[in-house]
């Protein structure tokens, strides 16, 4: 269905790590605003750029898990997922950024034994069995975040894949989110055997859901912006004229001061006030251009990231 006739549409390929998500995740983000909403464009509800966060900042506060099968006493989702014990030697000596395939001891290179013959695993992707960096942005979370043979899954220090809780934090899923009808407090009160049974049943579903997810922090930003622009009363021409009269904005110095210091009105409203405060607007055609019209013009322009101003 072609929605271009009904919506102003903005689409961008972005890495969500630049917009507040704690891990790298490149996706195409598409936002549409109905054309009958004249003063709101997709740019008004697009998420804001934010500084990147390192993996240490995101999960560094969680306790280390050294023992295979260990489950944090206070958090059932912070767990050391079990794997074949022989695989621990493959990753135990590698440093941040290194892969098990970098081991100089051939016995520590990922392999299987078939009919008594050692068969080394294929190194199709350089990010398999790779220990992650503490002080870089967390990697993209994939569906198979439960195994070391997947992409970028090995903890920076511990000899394990990231726990469910760590993956949740990297995907900006709130700690209060419930994966089960069983209350979190009750899950933590289970015996170790009961916790193991619960995780055996639910862990893969949780991990795959996280691997397929879109970071919640991105759509929380979009939703909050939509709520703000839709709930804010529309500034009428009469309202704008009242502000101009009360603040004496026909004086250019007063007008500039008002625009620079006022946080109550968005750009479109300030532009409308500036136009009406300009007594000479008919002489020099200094008219306000509606936001949807501006968007229609700029949306046809090429990306400017390769251009530089001298």
Where in this protein do the model-derived segments appear?
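Short, well-ordered loop/turn elements at secondary-structure boundaries
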Residues: 24-25, 134-137, 303
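Short alpha-helical patches at coil-to-helix transitions and adjacent helical residues
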Residues: 27, 212-219, 290, 294
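C-terminal target-recognition/interaction regions appended to catalytic cores
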Residues: 78-252
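Bulky hydrophobic/aromatic "packing anchor" residues in well-ordered structure
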Residues: 14, 59, 141-142, 170-171, ...
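S-adenosyl-L-methionine
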Residues: 233-309
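Class I S-adenosyl-L-methionine
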Residues: 1-128
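Conserved proline-anchored active-site loop of SAM-dependent methyltransferases
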Residues: 1, 30-34, 141, 219, ...
């Amino acid at each position: 269905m072609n929605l271009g006739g009904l919506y102003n549409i903005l689409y961008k390929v972005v890495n969500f790590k630049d917009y507040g998500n704690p891990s790298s995740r490149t996706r195409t983000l598409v936002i549409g605003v109905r054309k009958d909403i004249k003063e709101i464009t997709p740019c008004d509800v697009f998420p804001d750029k934010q500084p990147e966060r390192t993996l240490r900042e995101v999960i560094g506060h969680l306790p280390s898990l050294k023992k295979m099968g260990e489950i944090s006493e206070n958090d059932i989702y912070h767990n050391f997922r079990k794997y074949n014990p022989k695989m621990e030697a493959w990753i135990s000596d590698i440093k941040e950024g290194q892969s098990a395939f970098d081991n100089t001891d051939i016995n520590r290179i990922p392999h299987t034994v078939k009919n008594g013959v050692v068969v080394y695993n294929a190194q199709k992707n350089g990010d398999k069995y790779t220990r992650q960096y503490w002080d870089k942005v967390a990697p993209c979370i994939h569906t198979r975040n439960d195994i070391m043979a997947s992409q970028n899954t090995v903890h920076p220090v511990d000899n394990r894949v990231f726990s469910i809780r760590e993956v949740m934090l990297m995907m900006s899923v709130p700690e209060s989110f419930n994966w089960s009808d069983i209350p979190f407090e009750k899950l933590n009160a289970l015996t170790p055997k009961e916790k193991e049974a619960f995780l055996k049943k639910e862990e893969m579903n949780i991990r795959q859901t996280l691997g397929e997810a879109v970071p919640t922090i991105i759509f929380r930003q979009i939703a909050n912006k939509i709520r703000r622009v839709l709930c804010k009363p529309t500034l009428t021409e009469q309202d704008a004229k009242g502000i101009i009269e009360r603040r004496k904005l026909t004086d250019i110095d007063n007008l500039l001061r008002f625009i620079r210091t006022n946080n109550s009105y968005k750009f479109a409203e300030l532009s409308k006030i500036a136009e009406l405060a300009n007594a000479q607007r008919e002489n020099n055609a200094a008219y306000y251009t509606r936001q949807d019209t501006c968007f229609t013009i700029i949306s046809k322009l090429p990306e400017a990231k390769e251009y530089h101003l001298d």
